[in-house]
């Protein structure tokens, strides 16, 4: 089975959650093969390791894999950044998706 680069979607925190001073970003990684994938979160270009929770890849019905990565921030942290990026590395290929908090409020 040939290698397949993942599709990456980055979801912003919900407005409901922000009211509670919480901000969870969800990076959805799907349709990749083989199953080994590395996720790196960046805020304003700097690597973030605190508050990161990444699932083990699971097999989809099409025999490719999917995983999710969550970044837990406070609403104030989220609003203080210019941009937040989910960087996914798979088989030497890197896919990046970014959000600008100012555009998501």
Swiss-Prot record:
Keyword annotations of the record: Disulfide bond, Immunoglobulin domain
This protein's name: Ig lambda chain C region
Other remarks on this protein: This lambda chain expresses the c7 allotypic specificity.
Cystine connections: 27-86
InterPro entries registered for this protein in UniProt: Ig-like_dom (IPR007110), Ig-like_dom_sf (IPR036179), Ig-like_fold (IPR013783), Ig_C1-set (IPR003597), MHC/Immunoglobulin (IPR050160)
Top-level taxonomy: Eukaryota, Metazoa, Chordata, Craniata, Vertebrata
Pfam families: C1-set
Domain Ig-like: 6-100
């Amino acid at each position: 089975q040939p290698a397949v680069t993942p599709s990456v979607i980055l979801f912003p925190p919900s407005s409901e959650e922000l009211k509670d001073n919480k901000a969870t970003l969800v990076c959805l990684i799907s349709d990749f093969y083989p199953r080994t994938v590395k996720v790196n979160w960046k805020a304003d270009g700097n690597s973030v390791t605190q508050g990161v929770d990444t699932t083990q890849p699971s097999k989809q019905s099409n025999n490719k894999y999917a995983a999710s990565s969550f970044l837990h921030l406070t609403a104030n942290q989220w609003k203080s950044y210019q941009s937040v990026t989910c960087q996914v590395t798979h088989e030497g290929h890197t896919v990046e998706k970014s959000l600008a908090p100012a555009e998501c409020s």
